[in-house]
Amino acid sequence: MCKHFAVGLTCALSVFAAAAQTYPDKPVRVIVPAPAGGALDIVARHVNQKLTESFGTQFIVDNRGGASGAIGAEIVARAAPDGYTLLFTSASAVSLSPHFAAKPSDPLRTYTPVVLVGYSPMVLVVHPSVPAKSVKELVAIAKARPDALAYASNGTGSLSHVTAALFMQRAGIKMLHVPYKGAAPAVIDTVAGHVSVLFAGYPSIAAQERAARLRALAVTSAKRTELAPHLPTVAESGLPGFESTQWWGVYGPAGLPVEIVERLNAALNKVLRMPEIKKSLAKDSAEPAGGTPAQLAEYHKADYEKWGKVIRSAGIKGE
């Protein structure tokens, strides 16, 4: 029996190896767990167009938004690990949503990491009526008047929400949470002065900052970004070690053969070095990343565990 098992295993491995050498020989479905037209979708379409050109096989974007990315991510989790169903996702679907699932799952075991596409910091902004010109001044105001300041978020459990929760934990302050359904209404109400504070992606507030309708205080990345060089980091503004970034990654289902992972990783790294892709990412205030699958796994693990601690400490419950 053992001999038959060994022969069968050898044959199976040979089939996988042969398939990997010809991969892809049919269209690849790339699940984007977000609606069409958003930042994630736009970046995904640009990258997958280049993959199509590189392999000579269609990489087709399939938008499956809903439940903060969980619906699209689940499709990939249940797919066959043959390389023909991939996940092009933001951090929200794989670092945040799993913490709010009815049956929490470990995304590090659910998916096979392929490559880190890029990352983008958030920006801490306040309405001009708030007399704070720096992070330290904002913290001082919040400490003097607990719960007097209200902050907007893109929704309960969103990156903007957990980033604000981390900020409050680190600064030792309290602010009132006002969740919205997406970034646009959160920005609109902050500009209108209905709420005072917001963590948002830079593209969504850049025009408002230039028009002095919002005041940007700092970026949430570990170091200053070339995309907004005039802004200090939150970390250098009084909260050492503070970091929160939106990031994008490509994954396959668990068990994706290493040969296919390596082919995809090599092709994606070439794509991410292309000037036109760098330009596309820059429009969303993002920088390309690249690297190995192991580097994405390490980055994802740290991000997932960090937000888990913040969510549990703040008592945040999913919608």
What positions do the PLM features span?
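N-terminal signal peptide c-region/cleavage motif recognized by signal peptidases
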Residues: 12-19
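An extracytoplasmic/periplasmic, membrane-proximal ligand-sensing/linker region
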Residues: 25-27, 169-173, 233-236, 258-319
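Bacterial N-terminal signal peptides that target proteins for export
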Residues: 1-9
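Short coil/turn segments
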Residues: 35-37, 91-92, 122, 127-132, ...
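A ligand-binding cleft/hinge motif common to bilobed small-molecule-binding domains
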Residues: 92-102, 166-170, 197-231, 308
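Hinge/capping helix and adjacent helix->loop/strand transition within the periplasmic-binding protein
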Residues: 78-84, 98-185, 234, 247-280
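N-terminal (or domain-start) structured segment
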Residues: 20-110, 148, 156, 172-199, ...
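C-terminal lobe and pocket-closing loops
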Residues: 119, 205-273, 302-305
